[in-house]
Amino acid sequence: MAEKIQAIRGMNDILPAESHQWEYFEGVLRGLLADYGYQNIRTPIVESTPLFIRSIGEVTDIVEKEMYTFTDSLNGDSLTLRPEGTAGTLRAVVEHNLLYNTTQKLWYTGPMFRHERPQKGRYRQFHQIGIEALGFAGPDIDAEIILMTADLWKRLGISDFVQLEINTLGNKEERAAHREALIKYLEGHVDILDEDGKRRLYTNPLRVLDTKNPAMQDMANQAPRLIDYLGAESRAHYDGWKAMIEAVGIRYVENPRLVRGLDYYNQSVFEWVTTELGAQGTVCAGGRYDGLTEQIGGKPAPGIGFGMGMERVLLLLADKDLLPARKAADVYIVQQGEGAPVYAMQLAQDLRAAGLSVIQHLGEASFKSQMKKADQSGARWALVVGENEIRQQQVAVKPLRDGTEQQTVARTDIVSHLAGRMA
């Protein structure tokens, strides 16, 4: 026997026993996004490596340690499996000139790839739903996105288990002034910094504030705050955003250490977090990235978006027992005898045309075995077709869930009979 080949560590199969849960979540998401005017965009899972270096940032953890990068054997180009969805979406927007004299509200979903240590809620291949709102400069779109995510939690039934954290990263000049003060502060506490903090001190000092090291928490909490370096325009944007969030009744916590792990963010940033899943508590995160289109080779344009880890939301839904059971078929057709397979197949098609879901038994099996499979399928009824039913142009209807008696129904009446029983 050949050696069994298994899935790559951190890249998981989604099996039929759970795929219906994904379909449910995706269905809620699609309905929500349509309600807010978003259109679907689909981009390749492989992009040119410079796209991510230029957008995410060369000294970020993603680019330095987590990307799946390889060389194209045909032309020597460096290619990367996408670690996130924003860069590829904006590449497509710029390439196809989708912002010419208009704005765009786009959404995407699909697998992303990061080479990191697998753990609960964090995988090397993970699935993300993301949105990008492009061409909107004011804080109103920032607020609408918060409202939309809050609406999603309400539709899923998890509003009580997530909390919104917000911050502002200001503009480029304000971040530069804060960066200078932050480096000076960190240099005075270099003895407290761990190796990761020392590595980031001069390359990406803002990320030092995002440390999870308990020994660095007091130092990080006392560090200069970016909000204290905001100019009038950035402060007005932030205050306007907060006022709109408050006006629609959404509670939030200001977190001055919320900086996000990608270099393209500026102004508004946010995370929806939960304490129900242990250490990895972020279920949705995003922010504004004005100017990212210019970095990718397009004209400057304001933009904001978020990414949501689908596995983490599903873990939370499962933890709260909020995922639906698998929807069973309405009918399982049991057939036996000469002419029964064709008769059953025609019957199944008539029922499907009327909107019922039908499983027809295929192949040879005893009546007892077929009835056992019908019961295991979860179907509401077993329809029994044998030589006698074919001669009489009838169907035997056996309820499987409510204990009522079996009935014989004329073939011409079976659709209306079952429709009446389902009403």
From Swiss-Prot:
Its main location: cytoplasm. It comes from the Bacteria. It comes from Laribacter hongkongensis (strain HLHK9). This is Histidine--tRNA ligase. It is found in: Cytoplasm. GO terms for molecular function: ATP binding; histidine-tRNA ligase activity. The lineage of its organism: Bacteria, Pseudomonadati, Pseudomonadota, Betaproteobacteria, Neisseriales. One of its GO terms (cellular component) is cytoplasm. PANTHER family: HISTIDINE--TRNA LIGASE, MITOCHONDRIAL-RELATED, HISTIDYL-TRNA SYNTHETASE. The gene is hisS. Its EC number is 6.1.1.21. It catalyses: tRNA(His) + L-histidine + ATP = L-histidyl-tRNA(His) + AMP + diphosphate + H(+). Homodimer. SUPFAM superfamilies: Class II aaRS ABD-related, Class II aaRS and biotin synthetases. Pfam families: HGTP_anticodon, tRNA-synt_His. Keywords: Aminoacyl-tRNA synthetase, ATP-binding, Cytoplasm, Ligase, Nucleotide-binding, Protein biosynthesis. InterPro entries: aa-tRNA-synth_II, aa-tRNA-synth_II/BPL/LPL, Anticodon-bd, Anticodon-bd_dom_sf, His-tRNA-ligase, HisRS-like_core, HisRS/HisZ, HisRS_anticodon. It is an enzyme of class 6 (ligase). GO terms for biological process: histidyl-tRNA aminoacylation. Belongs to the class-II aminoacyl-tRNA synthetase family. The keyword Phosphoprotein does not apply. Gene3D superfamilies: Anticodon-binding domain, Bira Bifunctional Protein, Domain 2.
